[in-house]
């Protein structure tokens, strides 16, 4: 069971929302952020190093100080304004004609500690520490985390009533994705949402494992520092956008490798044939069409690789994943890449970039071979999280990403 509550969001007035809203901090580098950021962009708060010329280290104290200064300035100028009372909010995203409807709310840090907020990825302490600094210095969750939850018809009905009305925000970003936002204003609806979620068994972290872990750690810190702690303080909660799991779609997360580990192309193909049925598909992009099928781009040609029976364990929720099959039978066994987290010989490409990005990086000589995977399903993610298992690195890619700046949660 999960504990949620509404909050008084700090958010842009309607006339500024398109200028303030920005892509998340971790999907663009400093140079891209500097080029993309307009005067009012939230990137000045999430990527404050862009305000220095020349740019400075994003992890330096002057950058952190600038982030705090900018957050205060945005509020002083009226580009961000706090709502007068706590609300829940509906945030909908449209991509390729498909819309998903999330609830912007606060989740409780205790649920992360207890396991009611379920994760499917390991986190790195250095990344957690960096996110903790941002939460501490701002005393706020500037960006939300992305959760899923089991479908609930009553929640869907409440959301449907609000989205039938005029949205508070409604715009299409430069990437072509639509962003729509409503405020749930009726107290009876707010109370009912809180009650319903108290009976929902779990949240699942879709995207934002490091932000979730950092929020939980900051909450624990502030709890220890407060001799009058009651458990009701705002720092016990952190901001999420939670979507029904049936509405979410995971897209492919692909791999490109810099070398063939000393093999020729023919030797690689021969080694692959031990564990896969290998079929040359030609020069046109070839996309895998089912589980346990991979496409490979090598030497200007696409190949289909279908894992042979008996090469993986259908009863192992991790071993049966295509990312595991590829890692075990190809990346480790043939190409000698044993640790995806630390190897400099491999890179990862989100499916949103298209398979043409894979062939481009091989054709230009940057990489030697590319592998495209069939995407993981939400059911696989939920089953693995429920079993307490952890997916291999770079398994899931969710799109569209949450737009930052539509709502901010202050911890006090």
Regions found by a protein language model. Name each.
Residues 1-412:
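Surface-exposed, charge/polar-rich loops and edge strands
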């Amino acid at each position: 069971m999960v504990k949620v509550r509404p909050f008084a969001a700090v958010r842009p007035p309607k006339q500024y929302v398109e200028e303030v809203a920005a892509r998340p901090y971790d999907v663009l580098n400093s140079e891209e952020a500097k080029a993309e950021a307009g005067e009012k962009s939230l990137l000045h708060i999430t990527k404050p190093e862009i305000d220095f010329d020349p740019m400075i280290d994003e992890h330096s104290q002057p950058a952190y100080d600038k982030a705090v200064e900018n957050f205060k300035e945005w509020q002083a100028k009226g580009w961000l304004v706090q709502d007068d009372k706590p609300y829940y909010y509906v945030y909908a995203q449209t991509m390729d004609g498909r819309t998903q409807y999330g609830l912007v709310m606060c989740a409780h840090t205790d649920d992360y500690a207890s396991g009611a907020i379920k994760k499917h990825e390991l986190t790195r302490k250095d990344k957690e520490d960096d996110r903790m600094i941002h939460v501490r210095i701002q005393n706020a969750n500037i960006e939300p985390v992305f959760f899923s939850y089991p479908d609930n018809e009553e929640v869907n009905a409440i959301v449907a009533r609000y989205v039938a009305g005029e949205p508070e925000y409604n715009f299409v970003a430069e990437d072509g994705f639509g962003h729509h936002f409503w405020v749930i204003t009726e107290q009876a609806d707010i109370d009912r949402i809180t009650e319903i979620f108290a009976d929902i068994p779990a949240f699942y972290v879709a995207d934002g494992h490091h932000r979730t872990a950092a929020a939980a750690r900051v909450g624990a810190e502030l709890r220890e520092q407060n001799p009058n702690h009651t458990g009701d303080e705002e720092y016990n909660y952190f901001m999420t956008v939670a979507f029904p799991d049936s509405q979410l779609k995971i897209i492919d997360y692909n791999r490109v490798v810099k070398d063939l580990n000393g093999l020729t192309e023919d030797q690689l193909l021969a080694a692959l044939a031990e564990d896969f049925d290998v079929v040359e598909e030609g020069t046109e992009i070839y996309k895998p069409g089912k589980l346990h099928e991979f496409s490979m781009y090598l030497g200007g040609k696409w190949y289909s690789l279908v894992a042979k029976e008996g090469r993986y364990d259908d009863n192992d929720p991790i071993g049966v994943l295509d990312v595991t099959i590829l890692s075990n039978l190809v990346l480790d066994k043939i190409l000698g890449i044993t640790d995806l987290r630390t190897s400099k010989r491999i890179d990862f490409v989100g499916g949103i970039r298209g398979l043409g990005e894979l062939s481009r990086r091989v054709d230009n000589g940057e990489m030697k071979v590319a592998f495209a995977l069939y995407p993981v399903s939400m059911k696989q993610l939920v089953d693995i999280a429920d079993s307490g298992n952890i997916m291999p690195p770079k398994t899931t890619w969710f799109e569209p990403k949450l737009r930052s700046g539509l709502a901010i949660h202050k911890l006090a």
